[in-house]
């Protein structure tokens, strides 16, 4: 056991930080899992892979979120991992990376759409009474890095 170096503390300087990062990289799973956090929920309408979802307060079922409705409808509760029909279970991804049927521009920030339920847009809503709900950043042309924030009501 005297030869085991893994348990020794890292130096509190730049080489120590580099050692920490190298060890961290060496212990990461391969491939890295991007769909980190999600949950199963029943849908009350048809949803398409990548749709932004909200949870209906009356029964907890999920459907397409939209920024021009109520606070509940503008509060994104996750993104549909797959396409399902009404009454079926869908996995809602709340953290990580999710494929979408939309064409995205890598690196751009996205917001919940006020005109198309379930969709995301680069330009946030700007009309009084609508909500601005930041939802994430495009990883590439068809995947969104999920970073859901609370909706902000425009006045």
Where are these regions (language model features)?
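A signal for long, low-complexity, Ser/Thr/Asn-enriched, surface-exposed stalk/shaft
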Residues: 14-29
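Glycine-anchored, exposed beta-strand/edge motif detector
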Residues: 2-9, 29-155
